[in-house]
UniProtKB/Swiss-Prot annotation:
InterPro entries: aa-tRNA-synth_II, aa-tRNA-synth_II/BPL/LPL, Phe-tRNA-synth_IIc_asu, Phe-tRNA_ligase_II_N, Phe_tRNA_ligase_alpha1_bac, Phenylalanyl-tRNA_Synthase, tRNA-bd_arm. Mg(2+) binds at residue 254. Belongs to the class-II aminoacyl-tRNA synthetase family. Phe-tRNA synthetase alpha subunit type 1 subfamily. CDD domains: PheRS_alpha_core. It is found in: Cytoplasm. Tetramer of two alpha and two beta subunits. One of its GO terms (cellular component) is cytoplasm. It comes from Dictyoglomus turgidum (strain DSM 6724 / Z-1310). It catalyses: tRNA(Phe) + L-phenylalanine + ATP = L-phenylalanyl-tRNA(Phe) + AMP + diphosphate + H(+). This is Phenylalanine--tRNA ligase alpha subunit. GO terms for biological process: phenylalanyl-tRNA aminoacylation. It is an enzyme of class 6 (ligase).
């Protein structure tokens, strides 16, 4: 029996040291150090041994147990380390490889055009200003010399919040606010959103963008207006695009004109984008009406100026060759990701 226990001890040591993985090691522990292991058997059999051998085998069993547990712990640490190293090697990441490319958002094509237009005017010395989208009737109509009985004041043309407030129908109110708060000389552009009760079609939208421009100084002439806007058109569309100024009427300018450019979609042949006319109106303009100057407290005998308002939505149609303005507002990613 004594020889058998000694062989079992040697066998346990050898199997612990030869274990190839944690599963094998755990099995060795169960067989030799578990409840049914040989050390437990020794401790249980001590009571049956002769009196003189009990102390010897009790001490020896405890020494073997401590030695085997120490071997087990060291082997367990070794195998855990090797297992971790193997896992790290198998899951190794090559940090020199390029990462997965993220899909980034893009600036909306209309905002791109607005930025481009504003940059052209900034290079000509204009300052960028902004105004509220919720306006009073006074700034949106009265201060711009628009008569009380003008159709544009009707609720079927404008989005009224109450009797005195509405969503602005144009960015022109910004020029009134600027002239009230700053003294000439003035040279500003005001981009922003506008709202009208338009039925959506190829060239109309109830929400659209506009860029207002204003120049006030002594001896400003209509020739300067034409010069500035022609330079702008050639910078934006190219010098080969024909530009036309046609007499028009606006309550806040006198004389007034509309500026047309040759349609970039059909090259003047006529299409849906230009109403089959071959040209497209891109802005209205004119010399600031003396009455508007009087309303804001500027002497019309001393100062003159010109104003203009353009729709970057329609200009974007020309630049990108789009024949339906609704495409810009339908949020179709397939369309928008092209820009």
């Amino acid at each position: 029996m004594n020889e058998e226990y000694i062989e079992k001890f040697k066998e346990a040591k050898e199997k612990i040291l030869r274990a190839q993985n944690l599963t094998e090691l755990e099995e060795v522990k169960r067989v030799y150090l578990g409840k049914q292991g040989f050390l437990t058997q020794i401790l249980r059999s001590i009571g049956k041994m002769p009196q003189e051998e009990r102390a010897k085998w009790g001490r020896l069993a405890n020494e073997w147990k401590e030695e085997l547990e120490s071997l087990y712990e060291n082997k367990e640490k070794e195998l855990k380390y090797l297992t971790l190293q193997k896992k790290l090697e198998e899951e190794k990441i090559d940090i020199t490889l390029p990462g997965r490319r993220k899909i980034l958002g893009r600036i909306h094509p209309i905002n791109q055009v607005i930025e481009e237009i504003v940059m052209v005017f900034k290079e000509m010395g204009f300052q960028v200003v902004y105004g509220p989208e919720l306006e009073t009737d006074y700034y949106n109509f009265t201060a711009l010399n628009i008569p009380m009985d003008h159709p544009v004041r009707e609720s079927h043309d404008s989005f009224y919040i109450d009797k005195e407030h509405l969503l602005r129908t144009q960015t022109s109110p910004v020029q009134i606010r600027v002239m009230e708060n700053k003294k000439p000389p003035l040279r500003v552009v005001a981009p922003g959103k506008c709202y009208r009760r338009d039925i959506p079609d190829a060239t109309h939208s109830p929400m659209f963008h506009q860029i207002e421009g204003l120049v006030v100084d002594t001896d400003v002439t209509f020739a300067e207006l034409k010069g500035v806007l022609t330079i702008f058109a050639h910078r934006l569309f190219g010098k080969d695009r024909k530009v036309y100024f046609i007499p028009s009427y606006f309550p806040f300018t006198e004389p007034s004109a509309e500026m047309y450019v040759e349609c970039g979609v059909c090259k003047g042949a006529g299409c849906k984008a230009c109403g089959y006319s071959g040209v497209l109106e891109i802005l209205g303009c004119g010399m600031v009406h003396p009455q508007v100057f009087r309303i804001v407290g500027i002497d019309p005998e001393k100062y003159t100026g010109f104003a203009f308002g353009m729709g970057p939505d329609r200009i974007a149609m020309q630049i990108y060759g789009i024949d339906d303005i609704r495409l810009f507002y339908e949020n179709d990613v397939r369309f928008l990701k092209q820009f």
